[in-house]
Amino acid sequence: MRAPEDLPDDNPGSVAPYEVGQFVHDNLELYYEVHGQGPRVLVFLHGILMDANMNRRLAADLAAEGNRVILLDLPGHGLSARPQRASFHRMDTYAGHVLALLDHLGIDQAVMGGVSLGGNVSLLVAAQAPERVRGLVIEMPVLEWALPAAAITFVPLLLASHYARPVVGVVAKAFRALPRTGNGPFDSVMNMLSAEPRETAAVLHGVLAGPIAPTVDQRAAMDVPALVIGHKVDHVHPFHDAQQLARRLPQGQLIQANSVLELRVHPERLTAEINGLLDSAWSGPAGRVRRAG
């Protein structure tokens, strides 16, 4: 791994230096970042079509509290490989890449977490390899109540990426030419708008075609410290999904965010809650994520 150059001190989006690396899994080169050191590991995953930029400040803040936070760009996102076949972008396939990252870094157990897509993938990691999950941090899960709104939102994007490809391609090229700001969440949105339409279509198709979350019985078997963050702003991330997930997880705790952007714009309160979850997950014996059925 290598450390990037320090960002300017006067850049409001700057964070402490961190290490970056790549590894290959299923013939795909995947990019990751490691913030901080030590045995208290959190893997935190980005939302759909976003990348590690959106969570970099959170990673730095948690690293300053003695945690090791790992950010992974999933296939089709950020600096990782961008295969244009939908089969590469199923959420359960993404979960396999996360487990391969733990193997690559020699990590036996980690707290798993993420926002939206990343939260769902974290739940699938817990279902696939329960012995490796120490706890869960799930921000804005997309579960049963979200499906109609998610379909209404993403199916038009998928169709536009297929059938309006020349127009979308021109827009993406224009965004690629724009300088990045150093503000992680804003740059993550710019990177999303810069993607080639075939890449975007493959991600959306794969995510919509495959399983989006573990079964209800599998969720009920995840007996580890779990923090669920929800909000009441948009229908793609309905607060009811967050409520139901927190109730279903044996150790689930629900926190209501003040807005969809609180953890990115005014992160102090929620960052403290996440650090408290990490304290609980790593302070005693490991909980149990059982294999349902």
Predicted region positions:
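Short beta-strand/loop motif that positions the catalytic acidic residue
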Residues: 222, 228-230
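Catalytic active-site module of serine/aspartate enzymes centered on a nucleophile-bearing elbow/loop
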Residues: 251-293
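Conserved HGGG/HGGXW glycine-rich cap/lid loop of the alpha/beta-hydrolase fold
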Residues: 28-81
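Conserved alpha/beta-hydrolase "acid-adjacent" motif
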Residues: 235-241
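Flexible "cap/lid" loop of the alpha/beta hydrolase fold
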Residues: 123, 127-128, 134-163
